[in-house]
């Protein structure tokens, strides 16, 4: 993992440099996530483990082992009490942060689980994967609440809306589905956002409800999902887009491409503010710290 520090007083320029390198993984880094207070960093690796780091010290706090295949996704619950991880072993694991202990193993997918995301109130968890289905789980009990069927190919990304009443899923069928979770029935309705011409590999909501999606077509779409409006389409990546993250103030959007670069965009104008280079290998993940001062990028580095 690498850190690129940002000068937030000069929003059009970034102070770029490696702050810390995390090199204890024994496989590619597929995902990274900060705790809500910014004190802890998660990394998910092809070696089957989730790594929990102290952000200031850079020290490895825990290595969460239990998956029987590469860990494809990981995230903290918004209340900071839980960690969710998903794997190619078809399962999702819920971990207690305080005790670094696995609380639930959620089984319901038939193939690799590529994405997990918590609802803003930390009460629900969404997952999706190669079986073309998304599942919404009740966190406390591990019970399946909704089975979401409608995509024609693998689901690679998911995120709840800020109000928790809808879920966005991105698929290799080139569409984004917005699922209405207000229904009390297990099966819910959805509508499509169509604008990409390639597999959708990542998406994320902003705090105000904007939705960004990245694709193999090398573009990023920024949507207003409630109106199906597409106010911005960002072009500049030369290879497909792997990861997206809004800054906490929503003025910037970071994107990691399947190359050794991370781009930072102005969310108002669509202009590329900076192209960050210097990754050792493919940039698999990017995320802002909760205070917006640092941008973290994860690469396929195994040493």
Curated annotation (Swiss-Prot):
InterPro entries: G-protein_beta_WD-40_rep, WD40/YVTN_repeat-like_dom_sf, WD40_repeat_CS, WD40_repeat_dom_sf, WD40_rpt. SUPFAM superfamilies: WD40 repeat-like. Keywords: Repeat, WD repeat. GO terms for biological process: hematopoietic progenitor cell differentiation. It comes from Mus musculus. It comes from the Eukaryota. WD repeats lie at residues 24-63, 66-105, 108-147, 150-189, 195-233, 236-277, 279-303. PROSITE patterns: WD_REPEATS_1, WD_REPEATS_2, WD_REPEATS_REGION. CDD domains: WD40. This is WD repeat-containing protein 38. The keyword Lipid metabolism does not apply. Pfam families: WD40. The keyword Repeat applies.
